[in-house]
């Protein structure tokens, strides 16, 4: 039986905790039952962090085809990009080429089918911008790389997932004052379609149940506390219903996240970042996973940043990375099973 392709992990900012959590996750691979993964990036940066953290983590420089064979005894690393001179906790714009090279190499493996899914370690936007990175973040970079001539560009959707709660913010990194101007019926409909489609295909939910938070307190109280919920959110929900998607809303966000309410839906779509990320991180601060929906490949990430202040100290918690690795493997396996079934059906029809 052929072993499944491994996951591939980008290094993230070498001055942050990406190397720390990667190494500590691998060190706990047996007790955690982690799926095999390969790191794309600078081996010397990892070796330096091994020494600083006092860990026993041998590295094996290899490619994805041999990663699973090495994984039990050594952390597989595929060298990629320039060497990093960054020190833990000392962000430096000169690290940007190292970060991009790691990400490009990891993505290339996934797009070539040599890795099953992409897991990205955290980067610092300020460092990347100072180094000339032209994208707002990981997600936009990946969407641009996934674009194909003659086809619409992918519409990436950020979902924060845990066993307790899955949420999607319709708008992400915007000042709150700018949110109403960015909300449109088309945006919410497209977001709902992508969420429903990926929850069905990759998460195995036959009929995903979506709820849409109201923008305003009490979901606007029928227009008395703002007009956006009746003018934008409700028409979007009705449009999704006409397409056969199980959608409800707008609903008051303040009563959507207690256990009884959560039992009634699969994904909550919020109108702005903190509306849904506060409950998500309250319920699963260490175990949340950032999943990018709407891309032609699987991408997960720990739901935290670079944490420069604790990089290299041994205090970084790898739990979110562990959850991201496990979810990436689960989604990749589900997609492989679905592709196999579709292939069998196509063959039987032919």
UniProtKB/Swiss-Prot annotation:
Keyword Cytoplasm: yes
Cofactor binding remark: Binds 1 divalent metal cation per subunit. Can use ions such as Zn(2+), Mg(2+) or Co(2+).
Keyword Oxidoreductase among record annotations: yes
Biological processes annotated in GO: pyridoxal phosphate biosynthetic process; pyridoxine biosynthetic process
InterPro entries the record matches: PdxA, PdxA_fam
Compartments, record wording: Cytoplasm
Residues the entry annotates as binding substrate: 138-139, 281, 290, 299
Pathway stated in the Swiss-Prot or TrEMBL entry: Cofactor biosynthesis; pyridoxine 5'-phosphate biosynthesis; pyridoxine 5'-phosphate from D-erythrose 4-phosphate: step 4/5
GO molecular function: 4-hydroxythreonine-4-phosphate dehydrogenase activity; cobalt ion binding; magnesium ion binding; NAD binding; zinc ion binding
Cellular component aspect of the GO annotation: cytoplasm
Cofactor(s) required for function per UniProt: Zn(2+); Mg(2+); Co(2+)
Catalyzed reactions per annotation: 4-(phosphooxy)-L-threonine + NAD(+) = 3-amino-2-oxopropyl phosphate + CO2 + NADH
EC number(s) from the headed UniProt entry: 1.1.1.262
Sequence positions that bind a divalent metal cation: 173, 218, 273
Keywords: Cobalt, Cytoplasm, Magnesium, Metal-binding, NAD, NADP, Oxidoreductase, Pyridoxine biosynthesis, Zinc
Role played: Catalyzes the NAD(P)-dependent oxidation of 4-(phosphooxy)-L-threonine (HTP) into 2-amino-3-oxo-4-(phosphooxy)butyric acid which spontaneously decarboxylates to form 3-amino-2-oxopropyl phosphate (AHAP).
Assembly and oligomerization: Homodimer.
Family from the record: Belongs to the PdxA family.
NCBIfam families: pdxA, PRK05312.1
Additional remarks: The active site is located at the dimer interface.
Protein name: 4-hydroxythreonine-4-phosphate dehydrogenase
Species of the source: Xanthobacter autotrophicus (strain ATCC BAA-1158 / Py2)
